[in-house]
């Protein structure tokens, strides 16, 4: 028994959502990769659900020839592997054509890290604009951006976790946030005094807006989700960076998450604690920050030791 590729993809995504609790971003990524592979194979008369190992290898070779990074190729293969395992487990296939395929080797780049000084400049600029904004529309945006930044640097949340915070988390114990992360796993993260103050100022103005009682999100917006889109936050952050005299290209929500982790380790935090705060399932993901510190230490010695080579 075989299935149309489009129906097979929809069934797979439904299973990933209902049974495994996959995040919306993960589902969208799977959809893009699977539909791209299905379209490419359909042009050659092959149904993705019936594809053989050679067909899958061909799609990966095409990606490589088109200049896609090894990480993109590995992501595509991962999506296909999950897809065919689903078809096998449901009895629609007798084999897994991805079983003998290997993802191209990828070197993990060291994360970009902002210095404490530059993070300070960014936060100071956000606080200044929040205090000086007079026009109501500009004031709510400035207070929101300041609250987002202080919370992000205080907690190291993923940007999707940050913009998707329910308003209830800011109305309970202000010293901590209860965050629902990847795989629907909850964790508690402490809030700094500055973050609590910035959130409270924003929340006071937010609650005075018409319709605010009906929106469950801490950072509401006129969007499909009902909360601020992560792309909007990233764009506002880059604008703030430019106004603070920083290179906009070097600043993003993810860079601030990296800064949170790196600065904690620089000041003596242990790796396990940082792992828990970041919500990493595997400590090997967190260990990349120790490599960043090692690189900086090596550079420091090389530049300043009188007998260094």
Curated annotation (Swiss-Prot):
Active site residues per record: 158, 182, 254, 257, 280, 289 (o-(3'-phospho-dna)-tyrosine intermediate)
Q: State the function annotated in the UniProt record.
A: Site-specific tyrosine recombinase, which acts by catalyzing the cutting and rejoining of the recombining DNA molecules. The XerC-XerD complex is essential to convert dimers of the bacterial chromosome into monomers to permit their segregation at cell division. It also contributes to the segregational stability of plasmids.
Q: Origin organism of this chain?
A: Brucella melitensis biotype 1 (strain ATCC 23456 / CCUG 17765 / NCTC 10094 / 16M)
Looking up NCBIfam families in the UniProt record yields: PRK00283.1 (NF001399), recomb_XerD (TIGR02225)
What GO biological process, any one, is recorded here?
Answer: DNA transposition
Q: Which residues form the Core-binding (CB) domain?
A: 3-88
Name of this chain's protein: Tyrosine recombinase XerD
* InterPro entries for the chain: CB, DNA_brk_join_enz, Integrase-like_cat_sf, Integrase_catalytic, Integrase_recombinase_N, Integrase_SAM-like_N, Recomb_XerD, Tyrosine_recombinase_XerC/XerD
Q: Where would I find the Tyr recombinase domain in this sequence?
A: 109-302
Which SUPFAM superfamilies is this protein grouped with?
DNA breaking-rejoining enzymes
Is Ligase among this UniProt entry's keywords?
A: no
Q: Which Pfam families match?
A: Phage_int_SAM_1 (PF02899), Phage_integrase (PF00589)
Q: Name one GO cellular component term.
A: cytoplasm
The protein's predominant localisation is cytoplasm
Q: Record's superkingdom?
A: Bacteria
């Amino acid at each position: 028994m075989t299935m149309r590729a489009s129906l097979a993809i929809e069934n797979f995504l439904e299973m990933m959502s209902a049974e495994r609790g996959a995040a919306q971003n993960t589902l969208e990524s799977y959809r893009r990769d699977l539909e791209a592979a299905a379209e490419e194979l359909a042009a050659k008369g092959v149904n993705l659900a019936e594809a053989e190992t050679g067909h899958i290898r061909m799609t990966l070779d095409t990606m490589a020839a088109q200049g896609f990074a090894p990480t993109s190729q590995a992501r595509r293969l991962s999506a296909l592997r999950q897809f065919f395992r689903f078809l096998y487990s449901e009895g629609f296939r007798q084999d897994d054509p991805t079983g003998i395929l290997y993802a191209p080797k990828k070197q993990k780049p060291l994360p970009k890290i902002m210095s404490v000084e530059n993070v300070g400049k960014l936060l100071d600029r956000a606080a200044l604009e929040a205090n000086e904004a007079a026009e109501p529309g500009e004031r709510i945006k400035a207070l929101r951006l300041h609250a987002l930044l202080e919370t992000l640097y205080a907690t190291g949340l993923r940007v999707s976790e940050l913009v998707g915070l329910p308003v209830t988390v800011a109305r309970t114990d202000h010293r901590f946030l209860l965050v629902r992360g990847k795989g629907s796993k909850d964790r508690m993260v402490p809030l700094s005094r500055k973050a609590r103050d910035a959130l409270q100022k924003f929340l006071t103005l937010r609650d005075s807006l018409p319709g605010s009682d009906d929106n469950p999100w801490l950072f509401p917006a006129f969007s499909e989700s009902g909360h601020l889109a992560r792309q909007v936050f990233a764009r506002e952050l880059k604008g703030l960076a430019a106004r603070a005299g920083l290179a906009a290209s070097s600043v993003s929500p993810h860079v601030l998450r990296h800064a949170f982790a790196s600065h904690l380790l620089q000041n003596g935090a242990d790796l396990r604690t940082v792992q828990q705060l970041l919500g990493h399932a595997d400590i090997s993901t967190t260990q990349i920050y120790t490599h960043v510190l090692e690189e900086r230490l090596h550079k420091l010695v090389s530049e300043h030791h009188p007998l260094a080579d």
